[in-house]
């Protein structure tokens, strides 16, 4: 598998998504499914801005069925609060220095990333990834950037196939000693997210995920990560 030819390698899905949400926040382009407004129109907006009388009466400002918070960001629905998500737990077998242990640690890593997107809490993801790795730092930045003016729920990553779990020994990969390469096929979705006052929904898409899991200091840590689109073996 490590000799595969990649037809097109995309940036990590979170990096692409972060560019998009930043563009929405800055007004560079409309959100998915949102038609650009026409400057001169006699048609009233579907969701007009709250009137002075409404806000003065103490009623909360609303947009698209969502309450607008004091920071100008739509309020996250209580039924999808970050507190409704359970922290993933590292399986005991993932603590063993075996190929199976590396595989389970990689699955747990996927779970920590999903948890980070849904809650804004990147600590578990940080703990199992090596500081300085581009994959790690990009995702931490993107999650923090989103939660600085928004939120996300129903983000998901479903493992559909374990493609490969094997030692990485070829020098061309510049892997650290004691590294196991783990390759998954995954169906993923960004779920529903909010950027300021805009709601963004995502469809599912297929990716291949590669983790270099390295046994260091008595545990598995991801020393490299990659998300591939339209890859061909």
What are these language model-derived features?
Residues 23-26, 126-129, 133, 145, ...:
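Solvent-exposed, non-transmembrane amphipathic alpha-helical segments
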Residues 9-10, 14-104, 108:
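Juxtamembrane and targeting peptides
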């Amino acid at each position: 598998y490590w000799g595969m030819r990649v037809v097109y390698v995309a940036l990590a899905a979170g990096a692409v998504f972060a560019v998009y949400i930043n563009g929405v926040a800055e007004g560079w382009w409309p959100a998915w499914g949102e038609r650009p407004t026409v400057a001169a129109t006699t048609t009233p907006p579907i969701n007009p801005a709250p009137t002075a009388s409404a806000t003065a009466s103490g009623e909360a400002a609303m947009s698209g069925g969502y309450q607008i918070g004091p920071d100008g960001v739509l309020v996250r629905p209580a039924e999808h609060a970050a507190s409704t998500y359970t922290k993933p737990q590292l399986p005991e077998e993932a603590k063993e220095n075996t190929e199976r242990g590396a595989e389970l640690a990689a699955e747990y890593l996927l779970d920590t990333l999903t948890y980070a997107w849904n809650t804004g809490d990147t600590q578990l993801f940080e703990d199992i990834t090596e500081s300085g790795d581009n994959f790690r730092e990009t995702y931490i930045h993107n999650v923090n950037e989103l939660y600085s003016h928004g939120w996300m729920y129903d983000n998901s990553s479903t493992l559909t196939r374990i493609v490969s779990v094997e030692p990485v020994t070829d020098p061309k990969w510049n892997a650290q000693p004691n590294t196991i390469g783990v390759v998954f096929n995954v169906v993923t979705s960004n779920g529903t997210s909010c950027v300021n006052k805009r709601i963004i929904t995502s469809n599912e898409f297929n990716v291949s995920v590669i983790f270099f899991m390295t046994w260091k200091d008595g545990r598995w840590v991801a020393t490299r990560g990659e998300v591939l689109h339209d890859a061909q073996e």
